[in-house]
């Protein structure tokens, strides 16, 4: 394989923008599948990339399956990413290992809420992208409008590389502004590409749009700028070099168009992927040297250097755990010995495979920059595998905290065993899915990023693991905090024969207003009134006290604790005595520091026909929502709001019924906010009643 020609790309989009259909067409044109299937299982088969039964049924892509294809002797690894906000970790994971991306947009809806989330993630990982305006055959299609939205909403320097030949039901092809040729897609499944001269009625428009394109590209190539200013013809090679330079520098987003469903424009998009998106050689990747104070190391695409690979996705295959890996340096070979830098455990590479959706191909070797999969390796998602001569870790992926929890109860003993297996598997493969046993109720609690996220795991428990479970009502992850300052001076004393316990801790607590931090401990002890070895014990005790607040039993956050005095006993003082003194001191001051309850506030985006805009406003207002913005774009309306998570349960059903199923919403965690007094009283009462019973 020529690794200079390798492309690792992702296809990212808002849900229902036609992303899986586009991937399906790419597989078809690259001869990986022999028939085209539609997504929602209309023909009883379902799209090839949506290989989980559940995905085929819902018509949404959940797991990012990796597929290897070849287009005109360019090897391409495609990671199919989910478009639903509840599966954000899948998207984050995929982007971590990509070199380039295709952002798919609906020609009518344009830039939607999830497109904005996906774009933000692409920017976080500095992923160069092309835009593909899909569904140009739809009523109301307007690729020019979408190009403008890419500028106004995503702040991308979006430049048209093509213009459509006809729109809506008259969409028959595209004009390539670089080559100045018209392309039509004919024959069964659009496999015959017909190149013709540009139709005379579109020539003027094409010339005008080409001028705009060349003006934009002049920023990326001096030779192009000079030729263009002098009114001379610019060679195609120079134009292509300028497009590639701008795209790789993240300063240009080339815009292509067509209709994946109607088989228009997909092959030209593949040409653009090979021409304008980066190879692994074009991207800088770094790792941290664990043996050298986590010093940053530049990794090189070189098969002769020690191996560094990242496990970015786990799946249950028919032969055991399947681990998807991206090789950043060196090679992976069958029988090779590697070390997991997180666990320091050595292991041997067994079966090495290349994936095609859910079919596998055994291979002997994977080179630098490639994406392959391993069977039977014990690891967690995000682990780094290295040659034993080095100890590197790829920087960890950004992992958001879960915002919703649910109790799950197995119906019988067999289901209990299967549920335990399922939970072990899910927590390994998804760092945003967490589980624990509530000590008081003895219930198993699962936590995740949203209702759909947890629903999918409940379904998977039933289908894949045959675990019949009952679920409780979704619970919100509340927090407690303080709004005032309070002093403490607490003595912990226990003398009942034998070794006693003694420790006194004094100081004060106050709100901590620091972005991204929830606790700070300041030691102002002088003169050894608390010996140095017991200071960490105090710190530990305060943190223990914060695990469960006294208002409603949720963790306490945003507190700064300062200790400035204390006392110890030469015999009775100990680590545990000062931990208990700190816990007592915390509780004493907490009641006086005006404690309050915080709730997760979500950023909610509603999109739907303008005729339902009033209904959308109404639904948000009923849920204590604060409208932060609204946009009317002809027949299409978008409303943004900040809404407490506790008000959003079951919202999708209510939204569907009040908009005839025509509106959709997405939400993501924004911040924690103080609950209103009425809700504060309600939560306190509920907590106290539970404790009494």
Curated annotation (Swiss-Prot):
Entry keywords, A to Z: Cytoplasm, Elongation factor, GTP-binding, Nucleotide-binding, Protein biosynthesis
Signal peptide: none
rRNA processing is among the record's keywords: no
GO annotations of cellular component type: cytoplasm
Subcellular location(s) per record: Cytoplasm
Domain (tr-type G): residue spans on this chain: 4-281
Entry-linked Gene3D superfamilies: 3.30.230.10, 3.30.70.240, Elongation Factor G (Translational Gtpase), domain 3 (3.30.70.870), P-loop containing nucleotide triphosphate hydrolases (3.40.50.300), Translation factors (2.40.30.10)
GO molecular function: GTP binding; GTPase activity; translation elongation factor activity
UniProt main location, coarse: cytoplasm
Family: Belongs to the TRAFAC class translation factor GTPase superfamily. Classic translation factor GTPase family. EF-G/EF-2 subfamily.
Role according to the record: Catalyzes the GTP-dependent ribosomal translocation step during translation elongation. During this step, the ribosome changes from the pre-translocational (PRE) to the post-translocational (POST) state as the newly formed A-site-bound peptidyl-tRNA and P-site-bound deacylated tRNA move to the P and E sites, respectively. Catalyzes the coordinated movement of the two tRNA molecules, the mRNA and conformational changes in the ribosome.
PANTHER family: ELONGATION FACTOR G, MITOCHONDRIAL (PTHR43636:SF2)
Name of the protein this chain belongs to: Elongation factor G 1
Source organism of this protein record: Borrelia garinii subsp. bavariensis (strain ATCC BAA-2496 / DSM 23469 / PBi)
Gene (UniProt): fusA1
């Amino acid at each position: 394989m020529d690794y200079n020609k390798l492309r690792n790309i992702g296809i990212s989009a808002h849900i229902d923008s036609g992303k899986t259909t586009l991937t399906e067409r790419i597989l078809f044109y690259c001869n990986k599948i022999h028939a085209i299937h539609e997504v929602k299982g209309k023909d009883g088969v379902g799209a090839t990339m949506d290989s989980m039964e559940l995905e085929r049924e819902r018509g949404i892509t959940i797991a990012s399956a990796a597929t290897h294809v070849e287009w005109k002797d360019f090897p391409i690894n495609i990671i199919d990413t989910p478009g639903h906000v509840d599966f954000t970790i899948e998207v984050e994971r995929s982007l971590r290992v990509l070199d380039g991306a295709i952002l798919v947009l609906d020609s009518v809806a344009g830039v939607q809420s999830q497109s904005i989330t996906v774009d933000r993630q692409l920017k976080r990982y500095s992923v160069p992208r092309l835009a593909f305006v899909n569904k140009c055959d739809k009523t109301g299609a307007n690729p020019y409008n979408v190009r403008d939205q890419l500028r106004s909403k995503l702040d991308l320097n979006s430049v048209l590389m093509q213009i459509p030949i006809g729109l809506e039901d008259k969409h028959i092809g595209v004009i390539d502004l670089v080559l100045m040729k018209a392309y039509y897609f004919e024959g069964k499944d659009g496999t015959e590409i017909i190149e013709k001269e540009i139709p005379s009625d579109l020539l003027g428009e094409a010339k005008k749009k080409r001028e705009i394109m060349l003006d934009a590209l002049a920023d990326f190539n001096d030779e192009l700028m000079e030729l263009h200013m002098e009114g001379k013809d610019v060679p195609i090679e120079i134009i292509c070099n300028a497009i590639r330079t701008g795209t790789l520098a993240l300063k240009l987003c080339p815009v292509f168009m067509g209709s994946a469903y109607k088989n228009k424009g997909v092959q030209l998009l593949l040409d653009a992927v090979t021409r304008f998106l980066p190879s692994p050689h074009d991207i800088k990747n770094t790792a941290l040297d664990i043996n050298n104070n986590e010093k940053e190391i530049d990794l090189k695409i070189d098969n002769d250097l020690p191996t560094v690979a990242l496990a970015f996705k786990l799946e249950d295959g028919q032969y055991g755990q399947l681990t998807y890996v991206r090789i950043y340096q060196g090679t992976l070979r069958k029988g090779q010995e590697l070390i997991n830098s997180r666990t320091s455990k050595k292991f041997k590479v067994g079966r090495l495979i290349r994936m095609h959706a859910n079919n596998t191909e055994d291979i002997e070797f994977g080179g630098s920059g490639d994406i392959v999969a391993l069977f039977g390796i014990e690891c967690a998602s995000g682990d780094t595998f290295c040659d034993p001569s080095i100890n590197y870790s790829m920087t960890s992926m950004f992992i958001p905290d879960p915002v919703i929890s649910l109790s799950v109860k197995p119906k019988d003993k067999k289901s209990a065993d299967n549920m335990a297996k399922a939970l072990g598997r899910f927590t390994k493969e998804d760092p945003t899915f967490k589980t624990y046993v509530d000590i008081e109720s003895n219930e198993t609690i699962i936590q995740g990023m949203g209702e759909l996220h947890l629903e999918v795991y409940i379904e998977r428990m039933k289908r894949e693991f045959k675990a019949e479970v009952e679920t409780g009502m979704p619970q919100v992850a509340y927090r407690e905090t303080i709004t005032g300052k309070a002093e403490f001076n607490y003595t912990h004393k226990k003398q009942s024969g034998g070794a006693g316990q003694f420790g006194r801790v004094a100081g004060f607590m106050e709100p901590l207003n620091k972005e991204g931090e929830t606790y700070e401990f300041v030691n102002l002890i002088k003169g050894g009134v608390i010996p140095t070895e017991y200071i960490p014990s105090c710190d530990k005790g305060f943190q223990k006290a914060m695990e469960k607040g006294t208002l409603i039993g949720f963790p306490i956050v945003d507190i700064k604790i300062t200790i400035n005095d204390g006392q110890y006993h030469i015999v009775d003082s100990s680590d545990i005595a000062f931990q208990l003194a700190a816990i007592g001191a915390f509780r004493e001051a907490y009641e006086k520091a005006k404690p309050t309850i915080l709730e997760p506030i979500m950023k909610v985006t509603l999109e739907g026909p303008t005729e339902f805009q009033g209904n959308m406003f109404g639904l948000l207002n009923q849920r204590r929502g604060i409208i932060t913005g609204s946009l009317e774009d002809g027949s299409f309306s978008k409303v943004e709001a900040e809404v407490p998570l506790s008000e959003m349960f079951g919202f999708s059903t209510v939204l569907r019924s009040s908009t005839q199923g025509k509106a959709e919403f997405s939400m993501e965690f924004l911040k924690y906010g103080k609950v209103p007094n009425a809700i504060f009283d309600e939560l306190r009462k509920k907590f106290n009643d539970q404790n009494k019973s």
